[in-house]
């Protein structure tokens, strides 16, 4: 595939929203990295981040910043052409330091500067990388830029410039500028370091403060972890953590979540300890301690950092070949330096036909940038983009044209929409080609150690602690935060902790896991949430503002649940939509709301709606009525049952909200990506009047209000689910439960319970992030619609009183009409569904649909009665029921609560009678099929779908 002057080759990396390919210049045969971003998967925030990244990279040209070479936009993708870095990132470089001597690009470096046995990298290499990192940071600070995500994964490495002169490199990269691979500082015989990924970067003058939570936890400054405003010094903390990791081999602070990480930092009280056998010099240790000050006021500032002796002084301990003959940085005369012929320094790419050990270090940059720095003339040279040139391959048959430079056509960059604040924002994709087998083997080794089931010993305890630390580090490598509300951070941090816990994963084979993270170790693309064809095109559940709200997640993970309501393409959506829409022709109970059959978007909920499926265990039904059973259950099984019931209730509320949401957004991305709807999509774009699906402003306001309060209710139930799982996990950690009797039982029930809880947690995390994103969209839609109302309308912003904000959890800048509450909407819908189902039952119409309607109504009413209190185990049932009767929930008062309880009891009775009737009909049926008896009326076409398995 041709992209401008480049030919796209094999895929070498994949993220949630972009795919990275190896590319080659069609004429010079020099290599590039092509990052193809799928626009249909980007929400407003991601598009804004991408636009910001492109804007920043357009103006940055420095040898230690990865260059953006070109940019091409089509109707469906944006293709970013970037410099190709072949040695991967610094984290892999450190992790695989013991094998660097076997790699052809680094064997000479290891021969000259072997890694010390008590440390990570040789101090010569550490100082070399630090000098180059400082050079890039100084360039950024001169332009009031803060990167906000300095970490080893964003520091990419290229082969040393001298390796090209020796003929070691066979594949040559395309140069973003004349000096792209001429180091501004450091040694030409060592790998070249470049900063990558400017998705979080922003302009921040020295006197300004920011308050956006960005970066990766292990490298976050404590002021960011405390949700305080911060300045550019946050980057210096990250530099300190990176420097420590280069010296020691692991981050200075490791934890399973950001809360625990902050606790460890505070507990350390600025006492940075180094292993006794570590050979780092006192200068390096002093610099690390100065950078890792908790209080940013006490932390080393940028001028002092740039003037530190480690940065400015020559590197001690150089071999004779690397001793400088004359000062090279900075040149005495910039013009003379520019006119002096430079060595033909180049950075290459790993040859596809290389050895396995060579290929496993291969890496492709993510969103990146590039530029050249040669003081003192850098301000003049960096004002405009330099000429773009390629590198010539020595001894290659593909000789470049006689002119060594090739002008790059002016790059055109689309105008992106203005930024919109979101309650949560998706993390960036990690476009990395990691060695999955290596990573899996590392983690499996730890899991096998734990899963042997032998009694706990000191040696095993040490291994378990090491596994926990490794899990914490893996979690941190996977996590990025952008504009994340505190609750979202907690939800995603806990889900990551559980997914990476060796105690959860210990007894499970890798192939059987369904909730594990797979972003970095998996580059083959996201696994669809449902194997059915319509779902496969959707990917993640994020649709109309599609993207991973962190956390990333969107995680590139497999679905937490493989079993759905059925295997037909419509079964995943019809089970809930049938129940929600069979009740009445008046879809919302509002005269102006158009019925479902005439909406442009088709059926509702949307195609991407993935209902929560109860886990298929012997002790529970696939779809239950919420009735209590008297079977004695242990604590783990009780937790699983309560957690799954709470998640199911949240899913029913979510399905109701989706009906409203679908009316507001008739052309969701799930429909846009459907090939059958492309023609309609073009028509909609041409007709601006159809943007709101033909709804009046009043209808938009009402639908937005109803969707918003329902999403808030769903969020509260999802948060409670996380709290239940969190309380269970805390009890396990306090008692080290997986090593006690609970885990040592022969039947392994506790192991299964842990797996099921983890699966539910991963599902809840994805749904929580999705609801946050959609809730933010609905909130903005409501605010916009309210402004379009007549000035004398009660809902117009000018008529809002100060104290009239919604008390049910909506944002403080949103005011909804009096009487609009999630509980009332849910009660009315449940009552309507149950009444309609009762009528259909009496007339013998769609008995299977009646069962679904009854169950859905029960779940919805249970959600109305739901409180935010986490159940306490060991509490008697009688006490629980007494306490629950006294609780006043949101808009549900005590008297109203009794009405709801009686209605639930009545519906359960009708459901029990219906199931008896269905059982009798099933026995009379000539064949064991789930078809409705022929005497009944045909199914409503709106609600056609597979019946849930019993």
Curated annotation (Swiss-Prot):
PROSITE patterns: PROTEIN_KINASE_ATP, PROTEIN_KINASE_DOM, PROTEIN_KINASE_ST. Residues 314-425, 443-467, 505-570, 671-690, 926-950 are annotated as: Disordered. One of its GO terms (molecular function) is protein serine kinase activity. The active site is at 149 (proton acceptor). It is an enzyme of class 2 (transferase). GO terms for biological process: autophagy of mitochondrion; cellular response to nitrogen starvation; cellular response to potassium ion starvation; piecemeal microautophagy of the nucleus; protein localization to phagophore assembly site; protein transport; regulation of autophagy; reticulophagy. GO terms for cellular component: Atg1/ULK1 kinase complex; autophagosome membrane; cytosol; phagophore; phagophore assembly site membrane; vacuole-isolation membrane contact site. ATP binds at residues 12-20, 35. It is a peripheral membrane protein. Keywords: ATP-binding, Autophagy, Cytoplasm, Kinase, Membrane, Nucleotide-binding, Protein transport, Serine/threonine-protein kinase, Transferase, Transport. Residues 370-389, 447-458, 511-520 have a biased composition (Polar residues). Pfam families: ATG1-like_MIT1, ATG1-like_MIT2, Pkinase. It is found in: Cytoplasm; Preautophagosomal structure membrane. SUPFAM superfamilies: Protein kinase-like (PK-like). Residues 6-311 form the Protein kinase domain. It comes from the Eukaryota. Its EC number is 2.7.11.1. It catalyses: L-seryl-[protein] + ATP = O-phospho-L-seryl-[protein] + ADP + H(+); L-threonyl-[protein] + ATP = O-phospho-L-threonyl-[protein] + ADP + H(+). Residues 549-565 have a biased composition (Basic and acidic residues). Belongs to the protein kinase superfamily. Ser/Thr protein kinase family. APG1/unc-51/ULK1 subfamily. Homodimer. Forms a ternary complex with ATG13 and ATG17. Serine/threonine protein kinase involved in the cytoplasm to vacuole transport (Cvt) and found to be essential in autophagy, where it is required for the formation of autophagosomes. Involved in the clearance of protein aggregates which cannot be efficiently cleared by the proteasome. Required for selective autophagic degradation of the nucleus (nucleophagy) as well as for mitophagy which contributes to regulate mitochondrial quantity and quality by eliminating the mitochondria to a basal level to fulfill cellular energy requirements and preventing excess ROS production. This is Serine/threonine-protein kinase atg1.
